[in-house]
Amino acid sequence: MISDYDALLQFNKKPVSQEMIQFLATSTASIIKIRENNNPIQGCRPPDLSIFIKNVVIQSNVQTPTLMATSVYLNKLKSVIPKNVYGINTTRHRIFLGCLILAAKTLNDSSPWNKHWTTYTEGLLRIREVNTIERELLEYLNWDVRITTPDLIDSLSYFLGPIKEQLFLQRRQEMLLFNAPSPGQLKEYINHRRPVSHSRTSSAISVPSLTSMATVSTTDSRSSLLAKYQPSLPLVESDNFNKKNHVPLRNNNDICNNFRAEENIHSVNHIDVTMGSSPVMSHKPTIHQRLNFTRRGWSSFFKQ
């Protein structure tokens, strides 16, 4: 968030513009009313207030901080001078010149003397009148000529509002440019966003070899191959349901005799599995675990 103080510092760097002069002329005119003279003396009509301010600014070479500080004194005079008071044709010119003299002497170590300010008026005021204007303004302000930052912010709020918006947009643009990805990061991001190809030539998916493909076959297919080459075998007479081999046992001697009888039966009825040129496997083949084809991990977006 842009503060008023930052906007004020930015405003003080600007050169004096016609908008500033017109603002001061309007502020001075709102302090006191002028009673029109129906019979003005020829050659004594003062110049327009905005033209008078412009001529003084050009001849004195006053800068923006000193010039716009007069708005603080103008606001203070607005609360001091009564509303029902009327001035002469040069009253507003006198008020502005007195406020500018006070601002120049308060804010600068070295400022023009009153005789110099008299020449800046181009003959409108004399040196004695300029001295009187300065003393009267000091009495109106009770010799309180301090200019604080809150006073400037309050008096120049008309100019600070647009500057704050401009600074906000400028800093936002700078943040966007600062956080923008570099060309290398942008290229890496685009490459990571490309879809993975599933062609045979793509290296994103590992293709199993012909040897390992045999392990992917199902149990049913392997069983069908065994059934093709293995002949039907005779049943062994000594199965688990043979009553001759499974008689009730009475003691430990019977258990030992039963085990010996079973060994003799298996030795006699052993099946010879060597048959011609087509060997038959004596045990069921082991089905290996299926291969899990997984894509390579997607790269995450680049981090700022």
UniProtKB/Swiss-Prot annotation:
This is PHO85 cyclin-9. It holds the Pfam family Cyclin_N. Induction: By transcription factor SWI5 in a cell cycle-regulated manner. Peaks in late M, early G1 phase (at protein level). InterPro entries: Cyclin-like_dom (IPR013763), Cyclin-like_sf (IPR036915), Cyclin_N (IPR006671), Cyclin_PHO80-like (IPR013922), PHO85_cyclin_1/2/9 (IPR012104). It comes from Saccharomyces cerevisiae (strain ATCC 204508 / S288c) (Baker's yeast). Coiled coil: none annotated. One of its GO terms (molecular function) is cyclin-dependent protein serine/threonine kinase regulator activity. SUPFAM superfamilies: Cyclin-like. Belongs to the cyclin family. PCL1,2 subfamily. GO terms for biological process: cell division; G1/S transition of mitotic cell cycle; regulation of cell cycle; regulation of DNA-templated transcription; regulation of establishment or maintenance of cell polarity; regulation of transcription by RNA polymerase II. Transmembrane segments: none annotated. The keyword Cell cycle applies. Residues 19-146 form the Cyclin N-terminal domain. M/G1-specific cyclin partner of the cyclin-dependent kinase (CDK) PHO85. May have a role in bud site selection in G1 phase. Forms a cyclin-CDK complex with PHO85. CDD domains: CYCLIN_ScPCL1-like. The gene is PCL9. The keyword Chloroplast does not apply. Keywords: Cell cycle, Cell division, Cyclin.
